[in-house]
Amino acid sequence: MKTSVAARLRVGAVPFLNARPLVFGLEQGIARERVELQYDVPSVLASRMAAGDLDVALLPTIELARIPGLVVVPGLGISARGPAASVILVCKKPLAEVKSVALDPDSRTSNALVQVLFRETWKTRPLFSMGASDLAASLLKHDAAVRIGDKALFEPLPAGTEAVDLGAAWTRARGLPFVFAVWAARSGVVDREIYDALHQSKRQGLRVLDLIALDYTWRGIQDPEKSLDYLTRNMSYRLGAPELASLGSFLASARSAGVLEHDAEVALAAFGKAAGRPIAPARTRARALAGRVER
């Protein structure tokens, strides 16, 4: 008996190039009877997940500490060890002289990351406020602006500005990759079939990165060489021990910086003997996070 459309899991993903390898197989029909894909920017996915409008989402990692009752699908994420290319701070002044920063309305994690970096790495305390979708409008009122996704990757920088890569800044400071997003779900939603489907979707996507890059277009811009270089050199889709250590460190630092109001408890979904590792902070003196595994 076929699963009805109403019974499908509502699965949210971002409409950015960096997510294409993860959703490629789902778009080709993997778990078609179980999954209904929906697309939106990270900040909207987070709001919809918090409101109960999604069952599974490619969620900004900072939201794991804000939305209760979520579990992380083991082994899958969007991360960068070094330059991320699509997560930048566009500056009109040197970092030491930046007094005001426009946050990206599409972002949650990168907005938190820039606040952690200013506090713990760059040792300054600029004012942060929500910026505009238009970069020029944000820079009219601020010394710097956060940009994420395809607009950060493909949009030319305004004259007289420089870009600071936030992924590279994190890795230089911590020696760890930075995890921008993970597949997160409501507890009890992800069964073995969905777990396998998400992993199979990624495997299919990674096998055809050249085709993904060739087909991808953003606002009329099609640059297969740049897209392929980005997918193969900047982005990583694993969620192993280094990524989990980094995630714990980031959430603890966000708590210390006042970005989070409380310590985070993050759980990895597990199925029988496939239990994942609890997430714990690394290289930080912030209070320990409570790691647990859903069984």
Task: Report the location of each language-model feature.
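Beta->alpha turn/N-cap motifs
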Residues: 17-18, 41-42, 53-65, 76, ...
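A bilobed periplasmic-binding-protein/Venus flytrap-type ligand-binding module shared by bacterial periplasmic
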Residues: 25, 87-95, 100, 178-192
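Short helix-initiation/N-cap motifs at beta->coil->alpha
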Residues: 36-47, 124-141
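Alpha-to-beta junction loops
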Residues: 50-59, 123-125, 140-147
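A conserved helix-loop-strand patch within extracytoplasmic ligand-binding domains
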Residues: 76-135, 163, 169-171
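Periplasmic-binding protein-like
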Residues: 79-87, 157-187, 261-281
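Pocket-lining segment of extracytoplasmic ligand-binding domains
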Residues: 130-216
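Secondary-structure end/capping motifs
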Residues: 189-257
